[in-house]
Regions:
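Extended alpha-helical scaffolding segments
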Residues: 1, 6-371
Length: 371
């Protein structure tokens, strides 16, 4: 049963066309393979189901009466059938994104045939409550619209905080639902929300499954309600600062490579990944430790900035120490626009540039902590 659910929702877009007498629309992978799935994890299975089973659409409107696929007046059997976005939860949860025929032998499934099934336009498909959203603007009309936001392989979920909190546009339905439950006093004011993420990366033309993604993030639920706007700005600012710090670390790796005469440009990406690895667990602990009722945003931000500065500075020192003698002596690199000019790159110079950028990003910090 779990395999069948997975096939229906995550199947790739490899050719499954059967009809040869008529053109059929392109439909892509199964629905869950096209979105960045998130859900809320409870303390047990029942609580998990209740925390994700939305009895209201996000925004508070009632769903239309439930019509699962087996209760449709006219059962759909056509290949690659485009349908309207579901207006009721049961239809969405039971939609046949693939037509699967199971081959049975002595009460066992020994094979199957699969064709493309139902699909709908993902633009503004807010009936789907378990996805992040990307805010976009039509270049011709200027109208704003939203598309599901897929998870980026290797990118920690806390770096998507703006999309979880709706700072980036539309709040995911399950997040809205849990803040609604808390607002109705069905969840504690001290509730720690555990957000889980699942995603799939496909290969060229989505013809095969290439990689999968899982992550989880815990935080105080009050951070995500309407009264938590100040905290959302605070956390989002620190996420953005981490992005800038990662670029500063990557630039140090580039400059050290040039100082050593190495033209290989892969070191910067590896250095950025190393920085994110260093700050990953500390950031998660900092985020989970925020209590909106007793903490002050300025103080908590300063607490994190001290950690971030210290971790980045330590990583920078290690990179310089490991750069080697050639990097300390230095290397001249010709100017790309004017070959007659050249610039001297050395490890000490690269380190000074790194420290300047880091201190500019975190001006109240030094290697010993808060000034």
């Amino acid at each position: 049963a779990r395999w069948l659910v997975s096939l229906n929702n995550y199947d790739d877009a490899a050719a499954k066309k059967k009809a040869k007498d008529r053109p059929l629309p392109s439909m892509g992978p199964g629905w869950l393979g096209r979105i960045g799935v998130i859900y809320v994890k409870g303390s047990n299975l029942f609580e998990t189901l209740m925390r994700n089973l939305m009895f209201l659409q996000d925004g508070g409107e009632l769903w239309e009466p439930d019509v699962p696929c087996w209760e449709l007046e006219d059962a759909r059997s056509g290949e690659r059938t485009e349908v309207a976005c579901p207006d009721n939860f049961a239809e969405l949860m039971t939609m046949q994104f693939r037509r699967a025929l199971l081959e049975r032998k002595e009460n066992k499934v020994v094979g199957y045939t699969v064709l493309g099934g139902d699909f709908f336009d993902s633009t503004n498909a807010f009936a789907e409550p378990m996805t992040l959203w990307n805010k976009k603007e039509d270049k011709k009309t200027g109208l704003v619209y939203y598309d599901p936001r897929k998870h980026e392989m290797g990118k920690q979920l806390w770096r998507e905080f703006s999309a979880i909190s709706d700072r980036g546009g539309h709040k995911p339905g399950v997040i809205w639902w849990n803040t609604y439950l808390q607002g109705r006093k069905l969840l504690s004011r001290k509730e720690i929300l555990q957000v889980c993420a699942v995603g799939v990366e496909y290969g060229a033309q989505s013809a095969s499954m290439k990689d999968c993604y899982t992550d989880a993030l815990s935080m105080n639920l009050e951070l995500l309600n309407e009264l938590g706007r100040t905290w959302q700005i605070c956390v989002d600012d620190e996420v953005n600062n981490c992005e800038q710090a990662a670029r500063i670390v990557g630039r140090l790796a580039q400059n050290l490579a040039l100082a050593a005469g190495d033209k290989n440009d892969t070191g910067a990406e590896a250095a950025r990944a190393q920085f994110y690895f260093a700050v990953d667990q500390p950031f998660r602990r900092w985020l989970q430790g925020i209590d909106p009722e007793t903490d002050e945003p300025v103080e908590k931000a300063a607490e994190w900035q001290e950690q971030a500065y210290r971790l980045a500075a330590e990583l920078g020192r290690q990179m310089v120490e490991q750069a080697g003698t050639a990097a300390f002596i230095g290397h001249r690199v010709p100017d790309k626009k004017n070959p007659e000019k050249s610039y001297l790159y050395t490890a000490p110079k690269a380190y000074n540039i790194f420290l300047y950028g880091l201190r500019k990003l975190y001006p109240k910090q030094d290697e010993g902590g808060t000034e």
